[in-house]
Amino acid sequence: MLLITEILIINFFAATDLVQLYIVYEASLIPMVIMIGVWGSRTEKKIAAFQILIYTLIGSIFMLMSIGLLYSTLGTTDYILIREYIEVLPENVRKIIFIGFFIGFAVKIPIAPLHLWLLRAHVEAPTAGSVLLAGILLKLGGYGYIRYNIGLFPDLCEYYFPIIGGICLISILYTGIATLTQLDVKRIVAYSSISHMNVIVLGLFSGVLQGLEGGIILMIGHGIVSGGLFLCIGVIYDRCKTRILYAYNNLVHMMPIMAILFFLLVLGNIAFPITSNFVGELLIFIGLIKKNIIIAFFSALSMIITAIYSFWLYNRIFFVNEIITREANEGIQMEVNKMTIKEGGINKKVTEGEIIGELEYPQYIKKESMKYSDVNIFEFVSIGLMVILMLIVGMKPSLVEGYIAINCLELISK
């Protein structure tokens, strides 16, 4: 499945014909749907796979409409020819095509309210699926914006930026605040991923060189950091057999190496200096300040919210003491006991380890109940490579910036 996905993604990035683009864009769904539907880790994996299919197919209808409109007016689906003659189209036609591409790729980013499929997909997906989804598949939307919205319609990006900026700000603030209410650690990272991807969209559509460069660098950094966080959560779940936040207790004593790796990735998630996300977000905010100071101010709030829930997540997993954890568990039990299951007309009280929908009452994690005490060599290398890449890009951003600067200048000059 991973090999098939890789082939489809390479074809998407290399596509020079819009029909080829549409085919591989749709086909890239199939491996992920199978991966979640067959190897998913929870009871609602088939629903998650179905949601991915429906959301993406509905979004791609708008993209197909834009491709059809381009073909009917220009007589070709070749990207090079379309880019050369796109200016001859009437303004209203160009706006319709722009909106169609924007909605089609907005599902893949995703931008609220088109984000619901991603939350369920991450919760139900196996660890490899979550890493692939956060690290690569979401970037198809960002690349689509760069090549087909910004590359073909730079003037309309300027025209629609206030609307796009407002939508992204709502999405950023909503997902950031919603993260603080979650109990499932995978949902927390999934919400964080949505927030970061919307910051990327702001940078890409800012029309400023620094914003565009920052958006591309943050896409790289987000893929590294979010992928690493999902790997860490997968390792912790393998030991503790639960992802409910309040189930964990002082894991720093049981998994000290994991605590260090997780902390470094949390620093990357909050865009701490010398990490890849810092470079990307700094450039984006410089671009937004040049573009619109109000949007820049409210988008900067995302950094504060991200720091709050990231350190809160880390503290709850690795440093919460036994008294706090037991009190929290008692609070959860009181809330869960209000929910009942009717079996044969009889209300059934919820007990430890039982699942109500997506909420599983967690048993208190103790060292003797864990299969291993810390990461093994394979897990250490996998997560460690993510950390090293994050630090390399953060300390030496010119390694990637040099490759994207020329193309960004070309886009901005239009």
From Swiss-Prot:
Chief location category: mitochondrion
Gene Ontology BP annotations: ATP synthesis coupled electron transport; electron transport coupled proton transport
Any GO molecular function: NADH dehydrogenase (ubiquinone) activity
Localization annotation: Mitochondrion membrane
Keyword terms: Electron transport, Membrane, Mitochondrion, NAD, Respiratory chain, Translocase, Transmembrane, Transmembrane helix, Transport, Ubiquinone
TM spans (from-to): 18-38, 47-67, 96-116, 126-146, 160-180, 188-208, 216-236, 254-274, 293-313, 375-395
EC number, UniProt record: 7.1.1.2
Keyword Transport: yes
InterPro entries reported for this sequence: NADH_Q_OxRdtase_chainM/4 (IPR010227), NADH_UbQ_OxRdtase (IPR003918), ND/Mrp_TM (IPR001750)
Reactions this protein catalyses: a ubiquinone + NADH + 5 H(+)(in) = a ubiquinol + NAD(+) + 4 H(+)(out)
Membrane topology: Multi-pass membrane protein
Record GO cellular component, one term: mitochondrial membrane
Role description: Core subunit of the mitochondrial membrane respiratory chain NADH dehydrogenase (Complex I) that is believed to belong to the minimal assembly required for catalysis. Complex I functions in the transfer of electrons from NADH to the respiratory chain. The immediate electron acceptor for the enzyme is believed to be ubiquinone.
Record-stated family: Belongs to the complex I subunit 4 family.
Protein name: NADH-ubiquinone oxidoreductase chain 4
Species in which this protein is naturally found: Dictyostelium citrinum (Slime mold)
